[in-house]
C-alpha cells in the first residue's frame, strides 16, 4: 500500500479503483488489482 499526499492520480490508475473513507483516513481500494491500494497521509 502506498501512502500518498494526493489520491487524485491513484483513483485514475485503474477503472475499478474507488475512494473510501475509513476512520478519518482516505483510502483507494481496488478489488481486481490490489497493488493499486493507497492511503492518504
From Swiss-Prot:
Q: Which GO terms describe its biological process?
A: translation
Instruction: Answer yes or no on keyword Ribonucleoprotein.
Output: yes
> By its UniProt entry, which InterPro entries does this protein fall under?
Ribosomal_bL36 (IPR000473), Ribosomal_bL36_sp (IPR035977), Ribosomal_L36_bact (IPR047621)
Q: Which domain of life is it from?
A: Bacteria
Q: Which UniProt keywords apply?
A: Ribonucleoprotein, Ribosomal protein
The terms under GO molecular function for this entry are: structural constituent of ribosome
Claim: Ribosomal protein is one of the keywords in the record: yes
Q: Which GO terms describe its cellular component?
A: ribonucleoprotein complex; ribosome
Family in the record: Belongs to the bacterial ribosomal protein bL36 family.
Q: What is the protein name given in its UniProt record?
A: Large ribosomal subunit protein bL36B
The protein's organism comes out as Haemophilus ducreyi (strain 35000HP / ATCC 700724)
Which lineage ranks, top first, belong to the organism behind this chain?
Answer: Bacteria, Pseudomonadati, Pseudomonadota, Gammaproteobacteria, Pasteurellales
Amino acid at each position: 500500500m502506498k501512502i500518498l499526499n494526493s489520491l487524485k492520480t491513484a483513483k485514475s490508475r485503474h477503472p475499478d479503483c474507488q475512494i473510501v473513507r475509513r476512520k478519518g483516513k482516505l483510502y483507494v481500494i481496488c478489488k481486481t488489482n490490489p497493488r493499486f491500494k493507497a492511503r492518504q497521509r
